Regions:
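Terminal-appendage/accessory-domain detector
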Residues: 63-77, 84-326
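Glycine-rich, mobile lid/loop segments that gate access to catalytic sites or pores
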Residues: 1-77, 81, 96, 100-101
């Protein structure tokens, strides 16, 4: 999925990225249940292509909704269903990808080619981004960090702040920059302006911050209207460079007297591979907290340590036994 996403941008075409989740999940699941039968794997992939991608309308205003929270799970569910169906003897639909009239690329990609942006190795898994500190869409994570750092300078000067400027990369502008009316929490956690306004005012962002019932909601709504988002071409360039993969944002304040605040720049948000050492203790803390409904902290800590000690060649049952027995 990651390698396909690096080579083919579905969101630029108006489709949701979970289509590649479906393709990848279906391929792997078909391999598992068929003991590597190439005919069944191919049939699964082609049946998924026949399904086509879903629109990403539910990720953008004014149609943002909770579907974006279950879209990936839905894609995996459908992938498993298609894999099971593809065990049955059926056509392989071998022309689905390239057919010049009714083929997938012709219909959905306007004859552009779907391709891998990276070889199928461990690069993607080694570069996974962990959402550690803030419940915010990842293109805005470093902006939230920068805003939290700038909060101490902003708060005593909020009444004389004329403008808040965010310098960001092009994908962030395309995907999460939204100053229009935000209809619900799903809208707000995909608004760069909203999350930055929250971080400046409160020095933090939590899931409660996105609710209309949140105590600071009205002030956040007023402040986000002062925010200007501009592209920093360097940030866009380094976003796409494989050896960097920055997700950079800068924030500064323009005051009414013409002066400016310090510009705060965060190039790699916490959870990025470049900041793994900082992230691991926080990931553990998040794991313990999020499993507290099921396990006592001591038990959860034992599970964490056992998972960390797993080796790549360990039997899968060992992982299951850890979850059962701790």
């Amino acid at each position: 999925q990651g390698s396909l996403s690096l080579g083919t941008s579905l969101n630029k075409l108006g489709y949701d990225h979970v289509f590649f989740v479906k393709l990848a999940s279906g391929s792997v699941y078909a391999d598992l249940i068929s003991s590597g039968n190439e005919e069944i794997i191919t049939r699964t992939i082609n049946n998924i292509l026949l399904d086509g991608p879903s629109l990403r309308t539910y990720r953008h205003a004014p149609n943002v909704g909770k579907r974006k929270s279950w879209a990936a799970a839905d894609a995996v569910s459908r992938a498993i269903e298609i894999s099971e169906i593809s065990l049955l003897d059926d056509e392989n639909y071998s022309g689905i990808l390239k057919d010049s009239t009714w083929g997938f690329e012709n219909i959905y990609f306007e004859n552009a080619t779907m391709h891998f942006g990276k070889t199928l190795d461990n690069w993607v898994i080694n570069n996974v981004l962990f959402k550690v500190l803030y419940p915010a869409e990842f293109h805005g994570q470093s902006a939230v960090e920068a805003a939290v750092q700038l909060s101490n300078e902003f708060l005593p000067n909020k009444n004389v702040t004329k403008e808040i400027v965010i310098e960001t990369h092009e994908p962030a502008i395309r995907i999460i920059s939204n100053k229009e009316i935000l209809n619900n929490a799903s809208d707000r956690d995909h608004s760069l302006e909203y999350m930055v306004a929250t971080a400046l005012l409160l020095g933090d962002v939590t899931s409660d911050s996105y609710e209309e019932s949140f105590h600071g909601f009205k002030e956040i709504e007023m402040l986000r209207k002062k925010i200007t988002v501009v592209e920093n071409p360097n940030f866009t360039e380094t976003y796409y460079e494989f050896d960097k993969r920055e997700i950079a944002n800068s924030i500064y304040l323009n005051f009414e007297d013409g002066s400016k605040s310090e510009k705060i720049t965060v190039r790699y948000p916490i959870g990025h591979p470049k900041r793994r050492d900082e992230a691991v203790p926080l990931i553990k803390e998040k794991f313990i907290k999020n499993t507290s409904n099921h396990f006592e902290p001591e038990h959860a800590n034992k599970i964490w340590n056992a998972i960390i000690d797993l080796e790549m060649d360990d039997d899968f049952n060992k992982l299951i036994n850890i979850l059962i027995d701790g």
